[in-house]
């Protein structure tokens, strides 16, 4: 197939541009997708979502307090938007970056998978993807002159990623690992 995926920063911060780009793609029969954290109110993002062929979003942590600790915001809006997305019938996928000591607990992955199984009533979630930790983000912290809290952290062993995949699959959803 192929197409265009708009990613960030955060795409929803540039929504008018993203909508114009999606319209231009569709005018040329090019499919369009976004990668997003879905942290904006649904009524603001729904016009863009309606135009897309696919939405890829992150859900890092199931617990809102833990989400706030690690990202600076709670996850209520994100989870509400995933529910809206599932109800909309739009094809989507959800990803969790596996950050050692932050998002990689059995409980977190099981809770996210259970939530996704609960909301995927129209079976339009293509799959849930577990993304192993990528230490390449270090340059971002350096460019912002901030200390990287994950400096020196290594990706999870393949066996551990497969174990988390198995835990998530117990919710009855399709789970991929990268």
Model region roles, listed by residue range:
Residues 1-136, 140-142:
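Conserved AdoMet/S-adenosylmethionine-binding subsite of the radical SAM
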Residues 150-160:
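Short, flexible active-site recognition loops that position polar ligands and cofactors
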Residues 158-178:
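A cross-taxonomic marker for long C-terminal extensions/tails that follow the last structured domain
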